[in-house]
């Protein structure tokens, strides 16, 4: 980490998990400041935020695969610890009962380019009312909940997407990718 001035450190590395660093004795009595992030901000490489005490912090995480998670520690000194807080958000939770049902759910959600998260046997995605209603109509049994989203599957997350395309929209919510197929988002 480089310090431009005493107010604005530039965070370039994730030092570890808060609980693990406390267990190792690297964090003892230092005050812990939190940087609150929405789930989608944790995917960004360059970001400027403010801690819960008003300290400005800038992130430049350029190493491949560096993604911020809840309770990541990004700064430690004798006087201060800065840790990440991923804020809970509204989500859709699916609990497929079989492997084919899981595969179909992931396939259909992926076709809609929605970020997808797995937690045990649950499929989780950010809440979106049209998506929720579509999942209900498709025979899934979605539940609305509040969760911390962390680490989207790389195959379909915004920064992990491996291709680009242009597309157009009509006035009824349908979407065209230039390949002769229209679908609704």
Curated annotation (Swiss-Prot):
Transmembrane segments: none annotated. One of its GO terms (cellular component) is cytoplasm. Its main location: cytoplasm. It is found in: Cytoplasm. The keyword Cytoplasm applies. Residues 153-185 are annotated as: Disordered. The keyword Chaperone applies. Belongs to the UreE family. This is Urease accessory protein UreE.
